[in-house]
Amino acid sequence: MSDTEKPIKSEEPVDEGVDRVDEEENVEEPAEDVGEAAEEASEAPEEAPAEAATTTEAAPADDDEDDSDLSDLDEDEIKNAAIEDDDDDYNKLSAHRRKVQSSGKKTLKKRATKDSRAADDDEDEIDHSHIDLDPSMARRREIEARIDAAMKPASQRRKKLGEDDIEMMQDERISNLREKMRNAAIADAESNREGQPATHKLQLLPEVKDVLQKHHLADSILDNNLLEAVRIWLEPLPDASLPSYSIQEELFDALVRLPIKSIHLRESGLGKVVTFYRKSKQPQLRIKRIADKLVADWTRPIMGRSDNYREKVVSTRSFDPSTQEIALAVAAKRAQTLKDGTLAEKQAERRRRAHIPSAQPANYRVAPKSEIIPQNRGGSTNDMTFKRLKGKLGVTKTGKKKSGVSIEGRGLNG
């Protein structure tokens, strides 16, 4: 070794002795305070490397003495004591503890309902009206808000209409239509008096047709007395002319479909107008037939008659030859008067008798009474003819049997 290293060896033992004394004092302290010993043991490795760099090379022989001094300390006691202290400190903490409920039941978080979510969405919306914006920006936001509102699906909060609300809407619609029909009829009457064309009812006819064709509005039509407006439309105009044929056709077809009763006829006065169309010569033949059918249907329950044709009672009259003889005598007397009359009377009678024939609906109300008495004849001859015809039909159905030999040779022995 060199001379420079010798003084270093002579000086280091003094430091080792001091360090050894310090370590012995530190070893005796864990009995009093184990926590401080554990902290010093953890901090020792950080300070040791600087000292170890000088002591490990200079005094390798002193390691045995250090181990002998440290062997007096029980390492198990230090570990157990440190663990117990750590458990005590850990138990004092409250953050890691789980709260135990007194009821012992798990409480589930309720799901937010649609209404609550919608309310939260409404609250989250910010009102930007108080913010000062440029006119162009404000207009743009307003347009975007309108587009969003239009693109939104149908509101789920919309209240469903009940039956009462629907009936009220239907009654209101029928009442408004009745007033329109009445005003149109008054306007047409005034136009007719002034010599102008009456077109107000024709303009309103499509709307009236649309309402009268709906079956679910039948009760509302009858309850709100729409038949009164129908009567006003069917009445003749001030110049005694009937309304347009299209109006007559649509209204009479609607009257056939409606379940009209006597109370409705009494309130509206419709029966008088229909009877007028039935008896008048102005309406078309189809309208007269519909009017005749309506009168028959309306008077049947009043007269107590059934609508079943099997139960219908037809009035009959028997033929009396004496009345026929009287009618022939009256006709002969009239012919004699024509011969004895003047020329003017003869011409007048001829003009009245000769005319162009016109088709008229024949409505027979009295049926002739049958006086035929059925007679039972002997059935022997009828039975014989029936058997004879039956035998002939059987022969024609079976037909004649084919003759000759088949290809296979059948019928050779026959």
Curated annotation (Swiss-Prot):
Q: Which InterPro entries match?
A: RNAPII_TF_IWS1 (IPR051037), TFIIS/LEDGF_dom_sf (IPR035441), TFIIS_N (IPR017923)
Q: Acidic residues: which segments have biased composition?
A: 21-49, 60-89
Q: Which spans does this entry mark as compositional bias, Basic and acidic residues?
A: 1-20, 127-138
Entry protein name? Transcription factor IWS1
Gene for this chain: IWS1
Start and end residues of each stretch annotated as Disordered:
1-138, 395-414
Cellular component terms, GO, for this chain's entry? nucleus
* Function field: Transcription factor involved in RNA polymerase II transcription regulation. May function in both SPT15/TBP post-recruitment and recruitment steps of transcription.
Which intervals hold domain TFIIS N-terminal? 228-305
Q: Where is the composition biased (Basic residues)?
A: 94-112
Offer one Pfam family short name for this entry: Med26
Homology family: Belongs to the IWS1 family.
Mind giving the lineage of the organism this protein is from?
Eukaryota, Fungi, Dikarya, Ascomycota, Saccharomycotina
Q: Give the GO biological process terms.
A: poly(A)+ mRNA export from nucleus
Point to the regions of Low complexity compositional bias.
Answer: 50-59
Q: Where in the cell is it found?
A: Nucleus
Q: Which UniProt keywords apply?
A: Nucleus, Transcription, Transcription regulation
Species of the source? Yarrowia lipolytica (strain CLIB 122 / E 150)
Main localization, broad class? nucleus
